[in-house]
Regions:
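Structural/interface elements that position substrates and couple domains in central-metabolism enzymes
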Residues: 1-177
Length: 177
């Protein structure tokens, strides 16, 4: 139980900022391990044998809370004259992951001798997290837009997302799968 509304709000913001930072750490590890040729999920599985290991997975961080609340905290800190380096570093890492995923897909296409321009890529899932209809601040759009810049024909399907809302927010037509 929080002692005041300020304490309750601060608690909620740090819960989301902490999750954001933990995911950013694992995202950064995924980038490093990818460069080393090591499977990140294998590393995380092995690390998970330690009783106090925090089980986070690499991925996109969007939505209306986790990808936003750290900025509220950072803004307030800066307003008070403090520069929150870890919080902002986490945001930078997570905000870059869509581009990173797209660039890795492009590299895979090139390595396999596939044509990048006019390649067809199916993205299964647009909402900011699984099994919900919420598309607010979805970072999947970053992957889509980056692939489109390379001339990739991107098809998107998501049975949870509302077709009209997706078109209104992102100008995308969902494909049926």
């Amino acid at each position: 139980r929080a002692s005041s509304i300020k304490v309750a709000e601060a608690a909620k913001v740090i819960e989301n900022a902490q999750r954001d930072i933990n995911i950013a750490f694992v995202n950064e590890l995924a980038v490093i391990f990818n460069k080393m040729g090591i499977n990140t999920l294998d590393v995380l599985e092995a690390a998970g044998t330690k009783w106090n290991f925090l089980n986070f997975r690499p991925g996109l961080v969007g939505g209306h809370c986790i990808g936003v609340d750290p900025y509220y905290l950072a803004y307030k800190a800066q307003e008070l004259g403090y520069h929150p380096e870890v919080i902002l570093a986490g945001r930078r890492i997570n905000d870059h992951m869509g581009k990173y995923v797209a660039e890795n897909l492009i590299k895979q296409l090139i390595r396999t001798g596939s044509s990048v321009r006019d390649a067809k890529v199916l993205i299964m899932g647009l909402t900011f997290k699984e099994d919900v209809p919420d598309i607010r601040n979805t970072k999947v759009i970053d992957i889509i837009r980056e692939l489109e810049e390379y001339g990739v024909n991107v098809l998107v399907c998501d049975p949870y997302a509302d077709q009209e809302q997706v078109y209104h927010e992102y100008g995308l037509s969902l494909s049926q799968f």
